[in-house]
Amino acid sequence: MTATGRRLRADAERSVQAILEAAERVLKEDPAATLEQIAEAAGVARTTVHRRFANRDALLAALAESAWRQIAGAVEGARPATAPPLVALHQATANILAIKSGWTFALGQPATNEEIGRLQQAVYAACDEVFRRAQQAGDIRAGVDLAWARQVYLALINETAHGPTGGGEPDAAAARILDVLFHGIG
């Protein structure tokens, strides 16, 4: 989509996706990289980058928005409102870990526009819903502060994705996260 909401042609969408993927790779290595360096890594002309993104800030916002769209889609794909709560939580966790490993720079950017904030809130709301359903099913003790549980859960995901050992295979890492979350370390 363009800034005006018009749908891009398929080749233009491919160019934008190539630019975003190259931006993630290049900026992860050198956060001060120029748009020209990103264009070179994407295999497109510098003018193509400038035509799609007015400036560096616009590119960074689009990069973060794209990554958060993927996260939101991954969470929704886990069927948080209909799947059994622990199944939804495991699938969402594995999906998120798979995305986080490829979009570390983008997901580390601050929410710079309303759409990113909306996507983040949708992800957090889905997480809260799964936690409520898990508590109702008896998987989480009554009386547990679900807001605190979500913070711990998200911290476990972030540490798994960005910690010194790396995340590993997403499904196995999700199982480890949920084991620690639901059974502790003792």
Question: What are the roles of these predicted feature ranges?
Answer:
Residues M1-A3, Q91, Q121, A125, ...:
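C-terminal peripheral helix-coil segments that are non-catalytic and often amphipathic
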Residues A12, A64, W68, I116-Y124:
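Amphipathic, non-transmembrane alpha-helical scaffold segments
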Residues F53, L60-A67:
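Alpha-helical DNA-contacting segments of helix-turn-helix folds
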Residues A62, G73-S101, T112-E115:
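Hydrophobic alpha-helical connector segments
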Residues V87, E115-L119, Q136-V152, G168-A173:
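All-alpha amphipathic helical-bundle segments outside canonical DNA-binding/catalytic cores
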